[in-house]
């Protein structure tokens, strides 16, 4: 596990963007699972402005989770990515593999799981992303696996339907076996509200394993936390 700490959210975006460009340049093809949330939004803005010259034709984009809403809905992770990145770079449409949030959730979870099997290399009998980008909620959730549904992590399926604990909103999420089979997993976590969970999970305090984010242990050993100083305030 590596930990990168930057003074601000913008500098987290800068450091991660530099890292991502290096990965894209070093691979013939790069399969990336994207995350929603405020920190990826800043990353997308930064990359759209500073990394237009990346050869995006070698990059295939997927989503680690998506809300069960149409693609034009303001809640859609896909819509956010289009507005902040995809509309501003030259990437082939065939390289964008969105979750169909408008479709029946159970059927879409099954369909998207098959898409991943068709598009990604199969390693250890599991589809393998080059990079999975994850956020972490104040409650310790990651992707769309929440503490009250932590058993979804161990699903035999590639994708599952999750339910937000407060709103009841349904979401499609990749499961633990895909996350931990990735070549690299990168957490993007910023803000003081995350500091307690960051400390609990990274230092493996008692009870840490009740948070889905603590279950991110890629078999490759390549796990990187990109934090700002606020999120890292409670770790040494």
Model-predicted regions and their roles:
Residues 46-55, 147-155, 204:
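A glycine- and small-aliphatic-rich helix-loop capping segment at beta-alpha/alpha-beta transitions
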Residues 109-110, 143-148, 197-201:
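A short secondary-structure junction signal
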Residues 1-32, 106:
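N-terminal glycine-/serine-/threonine-rich phosphate-binding loop
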Residues 56-130:
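Ligand-binding beta-strand-loop-alpha-helix segment within the catalytic cores
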Residues 34-39, 134-138, 190:
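Glycine-rich beta-strand-to-loop/alpha-helix junction loops that act as flexible
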